[in-house]
Amino acid sequence: MKRLLIIAHAPSPNIQRMIDAVLKGANSDEIDGVEAIFIPALEANADDVLKADALILGTPENLGYMSGALKDFFDRNYYPCMDKTEAMPCAILIRAGNDGTGTRRALESILTGLRWKIVQEPLICRGDFKEEFIGQAEELGLFMAASLEAGII
């Protein structure tokens, strides 16, 4: 069974709802052969990444940057993953109170260094929280799981 790993920092109930929606989409009844799991950014490690076939990375925008928790994940795991996870398919989910540009740029820079492959346009949910963010997050989870199941990624 293939594994889709969601690594995220969800400090607010709304962001947690978005992560839950990603999991709901990824674990849809339409998908067989893919296990989707969530590990908080402060708990995830290189072994978790090495067991995964694809990743979704989620973060709020904090002062125009990713959360400290997701940055900590990369600080701890960048070099242990560097040469063992080249071309890892991944997607980005950003909950941005502003525009998310700085957060996206920082994540893309790190992912480029790791040589991971962003396989979906980053989902940046901007401005005040809207219920439509939940549906968008669920679609992201479904897309990643279906793509993994089909061998597209």
Regions picked out by a protein language model, each given a short descriptive name:
Residues 32-43:
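A short beta-strand-loop structural module common to alpha/beta enzyme folds
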